[in-house]
């Protein structure tokens, strides 16, 4: 697996930085885009919404002059000053009277701070709002506290220095100081800004608003400093790579990779030679040589000293190396790096870096030499680094087998050193000489001589023999040529056999299982990576796009660990799938207001439909003109919405963007691009899935649509007449207008000939204009487009119904011998027998041509004129087929029959307007069609015997 690099791609952390700067200061601010018309608001925090009572949906895209917060008592001079500051891109502070949503007013102190880019151009404005009454209360409380402290201090000091009889006593001064508290409380409760602006009091210092501005100058300067144009305080609105402190080393840099491999080789050297040196340091021969030739007589000791120095340098480098925290963020702050290293591997690295050879050189006693030699085995703690370094290769089968073999050999090497140390320690004290070293000397003809320290087998013979014994014992293949003879040797042999049986069973006995288990994940990774590379090679993807593909694949693999959630869920029953999905999306379903009040079953059904997606910075989620078939919920990160490369909105956590599906029968097209600024986690649900679930829970559907607040509606309002609104009474249209029942219901069916009267009707149905003329014009255009959209959809349905009815009429005229389907109520066969044989199609005088029209063909209006002609001599009972291109066709009679009934075959067809043709979600389905009205039912023909004549 690749190195865990963390979130190292360039990110636009503008919004996250501003929120992090302000979250501990209880700020109420908004951000406006200076490059848009009217400096539209693109973000407002929760504190602003709580202060004024508006939701974020109601504030977004409004001008940053905040005209919606002004009222009748708002001074025009303050509004002009604010507008002038925005127009001139100047920093200023404005004291203004604003109104909340509930019509309550309060005095507000507004700080306007322009934000410039790297070229010096103003791109954004940040407006900070403070309640002036709260500032006065804080300033007054601080002033009272200071005065109480000063009075108490002066009173206590004066009581000791004032002569008797001069001034009040200590008791009276104390009482006076305390007596001010109730009076201040009363004044504070009855505090009136206008009353105390002109007046003054001797007991309590009432601060005027301009004094508040002066006293809060430091606070405002802090805000300005936070919002200043310096690159080290306020981030620029652009993609920025993570800032790395000077002197720190990236954990994925080439230098760190080379250094890690060098340390890895040194650790392997330590693991091999440290037990060997510790075992042979116990020999008197080495000690005697050390005393005669000094510390540098052994090259191995010099190498050990160099290794110790390298380990110390590695500790210093680790204090300056970045790491990845639990949030996949690269941490480069030296203090945080030091704390993280102290809590982790510092103790192990420090113990392993102690230069024991220097201590041995300074102390010459045998006991100290033996102890220090044993302590050198602490260097084996460095093997933890090997496991940490090689863990990333644990999914490669060949590497795993190689590591297992090396581990087996390393353990055998350690046991061989211990086996030699046991024999070397016991040999001088054994009588008779039955140890394995004496037996080896007898076999080789190199017996030990007590007077000659150099006697006996060579070091190579002793080490190879010890290694041979440990390998044969670990693999349970003992030949007996090297055998334990003393009790210590036998106990050690038992331990070796126990370790060998465990290792043999766990490693060699399960090699096939280890290979299969380890190859599964890496096989999937390499298979997917190979597909990506083949796709890139086949389609000749350019290098920048190729790099994005590979980085996204690696990041997505590390993010999901190659787990396909859909494939995993398919193996579980549906009830368990719903529970798992409910757990995965629990944060969204619990905190989003739109899902509150839903039943457990509804939440389970919604959770199954939700999908989670992860987007890296710079990835475009929605392009301009894309079909809006998905609703997105942001759970982490921030995104920007662009129109013509101009930022129109910045969305963050808990924001929603897309299109409210309740307002339109068909999905619209996106009016902007949606691009990720940081690494984002989003929940998305398809339009069809959402409507399907809400159709199953109609009681919750109304609550959901009322509570759903889409932070930014991406639907293109000017994209043409594409869909029909699916609305409920009292809801909002796509542009935010509230429609009543008469406006949102199905409009009457209008004919093509009546389109000339459309404009006066639309003008009469328009709602009252708001006070702002510009908003009035925008509302009129949007309402007009909405009405035209309704009209177009209803005319399309009307045309399909008329074509269907005409095809049925032509089919009836083609088959005169059969029973007419339009004769309703004829039940007896005798009625058909008595029906006259002369019909319209058999008349010689008739010129009605229908024989060449296929029965399944649907005719248009022009084709009908070619096939249906009016005869010259037409019987009173012969039907006149008249076409009205803009009306629904129904039969009418030229002569009224007795009883007020109409004969369809003796009368021409007359037009009839049928209200309410729309309103069905799927009008083409038979089960959704409404019942036939009574005036549409064809009556019996006059020659029908069942017809009652008067």
From Swiss-Prot:
Keyword terms of this UniProt record: Cell membrane, Ion channel, Ion transport, Membrane, Potassium, Potassium channel, Potassium transport, Transmembrane, Transmembrane helix, Transport, Voltage-gated channel
Top-level taxon of the source organism: Eukaryota
Residue spans of biased composition, Polar residues class: 740-750
Originating species: Rattus norvegicus
Protein topology in the membrane: Multi-pass membrane protein
PAS domain location: 41-70
Function: Pore-forming (alpha) subunit of voltage-gated inwardly rectifying potassium channel. Characterized by unusual gating kinetics by producing relatively small outward currents during membrane depolarization and large inward currents during subsequent repolarization which reflect a rapid inactivation during depolarization and quick recovery from inactivation but slow deactivation (closing) during repolarization. Activates even more slowly than KCNH2.
Region (Disordered): 154-174, 719-750, 890-950
Domain notes: The S4-S5 linker acts as a signal integrator where it both couples voltage-sensor domain (VSD) movement to pore opening and closure, as well as providing a binding site for other domains that regulate activation and/or deactivation of the channel.
Name of protein: Voltage-gated inwardly rectifying potassium channel KCNH6
Region of interest: cNMP-binding domain: 594-694
Compartmental location: Cell membrane
Subunit structure: The potassium channel is probably composed of a homo- or heterotetrameric complex of pore-forming alpha subunits that can associate only within their subfamily.
GO cellular component terms, A-Z: monoatomic ion channel complex; plasma membrane
Reactions catalysed: K(+)(in) = K(+)(out)
Segments on the Extracellular face: 283-298, 362-370, 420-463, 485-490
Motif interval(s): Selectivity filter: 476-481
TM region positions: 262-282, 299-319, 341-361, 371-391, 399-419, 491-511
Low complexity composition-biased segments: 898-912
Record topological domains on the Cytoplasmic side: 1-261, 320-340, 392-398, 512-950
């Amino acid at each position: 697996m690749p190195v865990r690099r963390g979130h190292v791609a360039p990110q636009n952390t503008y919004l996250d930085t501003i929120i992090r700067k302000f979250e501990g200061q209880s700020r109420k601010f908004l951000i406006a885009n200076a490059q848009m018309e009217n400096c539209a608001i693109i973000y407002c925090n929760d504190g602003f919404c709580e202060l004024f009572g508006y939701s974020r949906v109601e504030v977004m895209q409004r001008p940053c002059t905040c005209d919606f917060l002004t009222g009748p008592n708002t001074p025009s001079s303050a509004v002009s000053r604010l507008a002038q500051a925005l127009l001139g891109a100047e920093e200023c502070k404005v004291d203004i009277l604003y109104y909340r949503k509930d019509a309550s007013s309060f005095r507000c102190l507004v700080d306007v701070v322009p934000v410039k880019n790297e070229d010096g151009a103003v791109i954004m404005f940040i407006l900070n709002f403070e309640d002036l009454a709260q500032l006065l209360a804080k300033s007054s409380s601080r002033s009272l506290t200071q005065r109480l402290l000063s009075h108490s201090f002066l009173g206590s000091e004066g009581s000791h220095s004032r002569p008797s009889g001069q001034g009040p006593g200590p008791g009276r001064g104390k009482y006076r100081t305390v007596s001010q508290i109730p009076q201040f409380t009363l004044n504070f409760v009855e505090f009136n800004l206008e009353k105390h602006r002109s007046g003054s009091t001797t007991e309590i210092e009432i601060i005027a608003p301009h004094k508040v501005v002066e006293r809060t100058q430091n606070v405002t300067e802090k805000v300005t400093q936070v919002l200043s144009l310096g690159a080290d305080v306020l981030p620029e609105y652009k993609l920025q790579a993570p800032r790395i402190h000077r002197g720190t080393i990236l954990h994925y840099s080439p230098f760190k990779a080379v250094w890690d491999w060098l340390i890895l080789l040194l650790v392997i050297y330590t693991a091999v030679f440290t037990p060997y040196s510790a075992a042979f340091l116990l020999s008197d021969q080495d000690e005697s040589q050390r005393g005669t030739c000094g510390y540098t007589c052994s090259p191995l000791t010099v190498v050990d000293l160099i290794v110790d120095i390298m380990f110390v340098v590695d500790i210093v480098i680790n204090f300056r190396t970045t790491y990845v925290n639990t949030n996949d963020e690269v941490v480069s702050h030296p203090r945080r790096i030091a704390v993280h290293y102290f809590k982790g591997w510092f103790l192990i690295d420090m113990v392993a870096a102690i230069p024991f050879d220097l201590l041995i050189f300074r102390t010459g006693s045998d006991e100290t030499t033996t102890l220090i030699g044993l302590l050198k085995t602490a260097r084996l703690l460095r093997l933890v680094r090997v496991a940490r370094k090689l863990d990333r290769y644990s999914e490669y089968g060949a590497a795993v087998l190689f590591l297992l073999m090396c581990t087996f050999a390393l353990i055998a090497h350690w046991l061989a050193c211990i086996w030699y140390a046991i024999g070397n320690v016991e040999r001088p004290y054994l009588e008779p000489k039955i140890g394995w070293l004496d037996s080896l000397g007898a076999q080789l003809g190199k017996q030990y001589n007590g007077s000659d320290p150099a006697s006996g087998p060579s070091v190579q013979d002793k080490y190879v023999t010890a290694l041979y014994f440990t390998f044969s014992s670990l693999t349970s293949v003992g030949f007996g040529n090297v055998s334990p003879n003393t009790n210590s040797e036998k106990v050690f042999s038992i331990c070796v056999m126990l370790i060998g049986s465990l290792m043999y069973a766990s490693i060699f006995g399960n090699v096939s299982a280890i290979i299969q288990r380890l190859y599964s994940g890496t096989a999937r990774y390499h298979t997917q990576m190979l597909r990506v590379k083949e796709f890139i090679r086949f389609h000749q993807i350019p290098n920048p796009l190729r790099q994005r593909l590979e980085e996204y694949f690696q990041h997505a693999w590390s993010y999901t660990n190659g787990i396909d959630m859909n494939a995993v869920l398919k193996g579980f029953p549906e009830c368990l799938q719903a529970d798992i999905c409910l757990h995965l999306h629990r944060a969204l379903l619990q905190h989003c207001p739109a899902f509150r009040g839903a039943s457990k079953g509804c939440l389970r059904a919604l959770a199954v439909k939700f999908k989670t997606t992860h987007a890296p910075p710079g990835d475009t989620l929605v392009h301009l003109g894309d079909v809006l078939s998905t609703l997105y919920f942001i759970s982490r990160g921030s995104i920007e919405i662009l129109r013509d490369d101009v930022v129109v909105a910045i969305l963050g956590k808990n924001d929603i963007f897309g299109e409210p599906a309740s307002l339109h029968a068909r999905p619209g097209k996106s009016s902007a691009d949606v691009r990720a600024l940081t690494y984002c986690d989003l929940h998305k649900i398809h339009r069809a899935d959402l409507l399907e679930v809400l159709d199953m829970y109609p009681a919750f559907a109304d609550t959901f649509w009322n509570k759903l607040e889409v932070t930014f509606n991406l639907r293109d309002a000017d994209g043409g007449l594409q869909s029909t609104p699916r609305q409920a009474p009292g809801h909002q249209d796509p542009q935010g207008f509230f429609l009543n029942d008469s406006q949102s219901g199905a409009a009457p069916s209008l004919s093509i000939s009546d389109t000339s009267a459309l404009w006066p009707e639309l003008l009469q149905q328009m709602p009252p204009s708001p006070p702002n003329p510009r908003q009035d014009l925008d509302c009129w255009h949007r309402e007009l487009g909405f009405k035209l959209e309704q009209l177009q959809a209803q005319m399309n349905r009307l045309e399909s119904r008329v074509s269907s009815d005409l095809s049925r009429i032509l089919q009836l005229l083609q088959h005169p011998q059969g029973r007419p389907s339009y004769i309703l109520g004829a039940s007896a066969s005798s009625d058909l027998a008595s029906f006259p044989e002369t019909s319209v199609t058999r008349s010689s005088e008739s010129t009605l041509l229908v024989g060449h029209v296929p029965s399944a063909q649907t005719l248009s209006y022009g084709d009908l004129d070619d096939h249906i002609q009016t005869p010259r001599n037409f019987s009173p009972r012969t039907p006149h087929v008249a076409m009205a291109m803009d009306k629904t066709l129904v039969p009418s009679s030229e002569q009224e029959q007795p009883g007020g009934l109409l004969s369809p075959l003796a009368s021409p067809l007359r037009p009839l307007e049928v209200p309410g043709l729309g309103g069905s979600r799927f009008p083409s389905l038979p089960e959704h069609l409404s019942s036939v009205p009574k005036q549409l039912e064809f009556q019996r023909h006059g020659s029908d015997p069942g017809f009652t004549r008067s």
